[in-house]
């Protein structure tokens, strides 16, 4: 069965740069068939941060080319992983009034609450990478995971915001762009690892995942 599209992950690490290409299907969005992998020694990075754009770009090209050859496709865009000591996280809250008929909470209300939390002052030298909803409060009821469909006057979103240093994020993007690739999105590497390895039950109970990379 022919795939509908391809998805490409690019792991820009301190010791190596890895590329993975997968086929995807709209009929089964959870399914990914790995068709190409590539890796190259990482040049131009120190502890996960690009310190030499030209060398990093060359390493990216080498890794992507190897994966393209295996998959028999040409890559135009990637999801790029990011890590490093410049990554920081903080919690934030966003509160909105529920304005729908009967004060029933909709997805629009949830999105507004999350965006309000995201809009809290972020220093000019920081760039938001992820906004991760933790839970919600409806009026006086706390710890709600899925508020859509509930009724209330006041909706509060409690989120965890992950940011990176603007200079480090933009330098990473430039290195990828210089390799002839656009970036679909930036993903924090520990989150990517957790989503690919841990089960829902493990995340719910609580587990520690340690990624011992070259820059650790």
Describe these PLM feature segments:
Residues 1-14, 20-210:
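Nucleotide/phosphate-binding catalytic cleft detector across ATP-hydrolyzing
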Residues 211-216:
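Short, intrinsically disordered, charge-balanced linker/junction segments flanking boundaries
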